[in-house]
Amino acid sequence: MQRSNHTVTEFILLGFTTDPGMQLGLFVVFLGVYSLTVVGNSTLIVLICNDSHLHTPMYFVVGNLSFLDLWYSSVYTPKILVICISEDKSISFAGCLCQFFFSAGLAYSECCLLAAMAYDRYVAISKPLLYAQAMSIKLCALLVAVSYCGGFINSSIITKKTFSFNFCCENIIDDFFCDLLPLVKLACGEKGCYKFLMYFLLASNVICPAVLILASYLFIITSVLRISSSQGRLKAFSTCSSHLTSVTLYYGSILYIYALPRSSYSFDMDKIVSTFYTEVLPMLNPMIYSLRNKDVKEALKKLLP
């Protein structure tokens, strides 16, 4: 730590444990999870690109979600693996900044993508005859582009504000990556304006997409209840089940960490929940979107010899 300018040149990531046996076990687990994430998401992207039956608005967005999950997991896992097997737990100031920027940008983008998918499901169920016109590839591309651009613009704002603080107290982060809350805890100076910005971005990038998702599902439920046959209603709900599962798991994790009152906040619980949405969920998403999907299964059969 450089005392002359009262800031730090690197941070120390404590990770999960200091026990060598546990660290080795965690290394094997995280390597296995990351391998499945890479294989699952890469396979889904290849299937969507290669099979003409999957060249639809829904799969266009699903493919982008797989790409995002692949990128998202890759932001964290290499450093986690190093922390698990190396005595050097440090990450440079620049490395921490980059990890923070990409993790925030991808998290914001995923919230918007999930909202776009909810709208896609609403159009598919409520206006099936006009689906191709209402959800054109151009519109899907625009929704994806807005999701990424909006996510990373907002990420650049919070990143610049976060790393403009002086970290003059300690450089030890009680986490396995450079997350917002542990960094804010280390920062010195007035944080009133920062907290306002933090909650504003939380509201605009997480809560607003969540409201849009809820609104879409309210309209979906209304449309489904108008379907006369029980088989038709079941098929309509089945169409939304994979997306609803993904939304519940992702938003449940995000809101638990960032919207929970500070009086009940725990860094240990934060690590567990963060592990779920940064490592486990990107691995599960390809399974969630493909296990019950006949089109994906057929495309996989064609791809395999």
From Swiss-Prot:
* Source organism (scientific name): Homo sapiens (Human)
Keyword Cytoplasm part of the UniProt annotation: no
For this entry, the protein name equals Olfactory receptor 9G9
According to the UniProt entry, its GO molecular function terms are:
G protein-coupled receptor activity; olfactory receptor activity
The UniProt function text for this chain reads: Odorant receptor.
**InterPro entries with a match to the protein in the record:** GPCR_Rhodpsn, GPCR_Rhodpsn_7TM, Olfact_rcpt
**Membrane topology designation:** Multi-pass membrane protein
Keyword annotations for this protein, in alphabetical order, are: Cell membrane, Disulfide bond, G-protein coupled receptor, Glycoprotein, Membrane, Olfaction, Receptor, Sensory transduction, Transducer, Transmembrane, Transmembrane helix
Q: List the disulfide bonds.
A: C96-C178
Among PROSITE patterns, the record links this protein to: G_PROTEIN_RECEP_F1_1 (PS00237), G_PROTEIN_RECEP_F1_2 (PS50262)
Topological domains on the Extracellular side lie at: 1-27, 86-96, 160-200, 261-271
Give the CC-aspect GO terms: plasma membrane
Q: Which Pfam families match?
A: 7tm_4
Q: Does the keyword Disulfide bond apply?
A: yes
